[in-house]
Amino acid sequence: MSAGWRLRGNSRLRVIVGLALIATVTYASYQAGRFSGTTVITAPDEAWASNDASSQAFDNLLTSLSFAASEAYSASQTGETGLSSDKSYEYLLELLAASIEMQLSKGDPSAPEFTDWMSGYRKFLGDSPDARYLTAPIDSAYDYELTFDMGDADYLGVVIYDTNPLTGWNRASDSLYFLAENPPRENLIRLASRDTSTQTNDQPSGYELQLSKTAHTVMVRTYRFNAAVEDNSRIAISVDQTRPREPVDDALSVERRLANTTRFFNETWRGSRALARATASTANAFDQPAEVSPDFVGIFYPTPDNSYHGGAFDLAPHEHLVINGKAPDSAFWSVTLQNHWMQSLEPSIGQASLRGDEITVRDGRYRIWIGALPPPEGENWLSTGGLQQGLVAIRYLLATSEEAPTARVISTKHSMDEAIR
């Protein structure tokens, strides 16, 4: 072999060895990172947060999440939820995200901001595909101004919530609404405590809602009567600077807002579970539960212009729950299926929500079949997508005439034929 070939051969060998070393180091680095990335972090000493109030509040929030996950896991194992534990974990994390935004990031009533409850991926407390819910924290120590534009929304309603002194539950203390067919003459709503609203006759233009001493939340709801129309409504809230008042707190501390985050998270998931358990006792019948847990208080946000009906379903694969009712005289109505945690079912499983204008009505009455399999031809159908257990939410908006619908289980083709005669 010539010297030239030996030189080139040695060069190739050096290149091969170098590449092998690079590959070895890269693989070792990957494995080290993979190992460290999957290593479980050791739990801290239980006393780590004992000497600091904010740390205690932070630890309480994490403890609440862990406890809720353990309860959700147990409920999934017993079949109580009809869902896998993974689905319940997704719900809890969605609720946590909303709780943090609502009570921590935007939880200061001296500088309020609206939280869009069902923004993006989040679903909780009986969401509806046709509605939008926004809330902001308020305090009677301040006056507020709401500026809004209904956009293409067909309905916009505002509710002030305070605390019922007898029960401790949320109470709708004042409210108003607008319909697109009779639009507002002004785009300003003032929120004022009773003493400031009567101090002067020099009132600015717009509408006014009164704040009681225990007022804590303002909720704005918008509805689209046509699902093809996107909700482009806009609303903002600010402290009324023309009426300076002595504030209770210039800003809520992180400790306080963390505590409020934990409270809202706990009350909401426990309240949702309480409702599901209560209605499960009368599944497939729409009867009033004989008993409701005090935990139900966590989801009680009454709306003066909505009436609600429905209950739970618990169906075998070959069964249907058939709802019979009188079509209400209302501005809007809908029937929506939800899971154990009051989350509307995904459209990907099939039609799981119907507006009144989508429901076939015969002689002033409607009939809706709920189940995994299609009903007889020409009948209204809501698909469970194979979900055995869940909730049926029927809402009538601004109803002037209504009656409570009924429900019964149909289990065979013969019975199906009998039901439609």
What role is predicted for each listed range?
Residues S2-L21, A28:
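N-terminal Sec-pathway targeting helices
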Residues A28-R421:
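A compositional/structural signature for long, glycine/proline-rich flexible linkers
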